[in-house]
Amino acid sequence: DIIVISDHLKPETNRQLAQYPITLLQARFKKSSKMKSVKSAISQLQEGQYDIVLIMNADNVVDTNFLEVVNNTYASGSNAIQTHRIYQERPSNVSILNAITDEINNSILRAGHVNLGLSASLNGSGTAIDFTWFKENIRHLKDDDDEKVIESLLLRERIYVEYLNNTHVYALKNSGKKKFYTQHSTWIKTQYYSLFTNIGNLPGAILSGKFDYADRILQWFIFPRTILLGILLLFSFLSVYFHWSACLKWWGLLLTFLLTMAIATPNYLVDSKFNKAMKAIPFLAAGMIFNMLLRKKK
C-alpha cells in the first residue's frame, strides 16, 4: 500500500493524487517537518498491519524490481535496510554538490562500512524498517528529529542496517542556494544534537560490544566535511609561515583528505560540470557560514 502525506500541497495536486490507488492523508501543520508527517501516517495504521515501512520523498522514483529486492532482503533477516539514492538531474552547482556529497556518504558511510562488517548509515529516503519496530519507536520521537535519532535507536538495540548498493532510488528535485544553506545548517545542527544526546552512552557501547553504535557516535565527533576542508585549507596556508615540519603535517592531512574524497566520488559524476561545481565550493561554504551566523543573531 502507498500512503502519501499531503502537507500544504495545492488543492489541484491533492485532486490529482486522489485519482491514484493510494491512501492520501491531508495535513496542514503550522510547522511542517518530515518526522511529523511520518508520525501522523503511522499513527493511523494498525499494529501488525504490514511487515515493512518504506520511507520515500515526494520526488523519488524507483526501478520496477525495487520493492521485490527490498522484500527479499527483509525476508532474509534484515530488519533495517538503506538503498542507494542517486540524484538523477544535476543542472546546477548546488545539485551537483548535493549529488557528490550523497555519493561520498554512500561510498564511506554505507558501502565502506558494510564491507567492514559495520552497520550502514541512514539517509532519510529509500529506507525500509520493520513495521512493528518502527511503529513502536516512532511515537517516542520529537517532531524535529531526523534519521540520526532513528539510527541511534536501531543501533542501541543491535539492529544492523543493511545497504543495497545496486538498488537505486532516483531523486529528481533540484534545490537552490537558499535551500542548500538551510539544509546543510540543519545537518550540522542535528549532527551535534545527536552527538551530545548519545556521547554519554559511548563507554557503555564499547564495553558491551555495541560497536556499530560506538562507531556512529565517534563519527558525529568529526567536523562536517565543508568545515573540515576549510580548517585544513586555513592551517595549511598558515603553516607555510611557520616551521617546515608543521607545514608538511598540514599539507599532508589536506592531500589525504582530498584524495579520500576523490576516491569516494564515482566516475559518473566527474564530467564537464564537475570542475565548475568544485570552483563554487568556497563561495557556497562562505554563504553557508554567513547564513548560520545570521540565523543565530535572529
Language model segments and positions:
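Catalytic donor-sugar/metal-binding loop of nucleotide-sugar-dependent glycosyltransferases
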Residues: 151-170
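A conserved acidic beta->alpha catalytic loop
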Residues: 6-13, 28-31, 61
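Acidic donor-binding/catalytic loop of UDP-sugar-dependent glycosyltransferases
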Residues: 12, 57-72
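Hydrophobic targeting segments
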Residues: 1-6, 24
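Basic/Trp-rich segment in TM-proximal cytosolic loops or flexible interdomain/linker regions
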Residues: 116-117, 175-261, 265-282
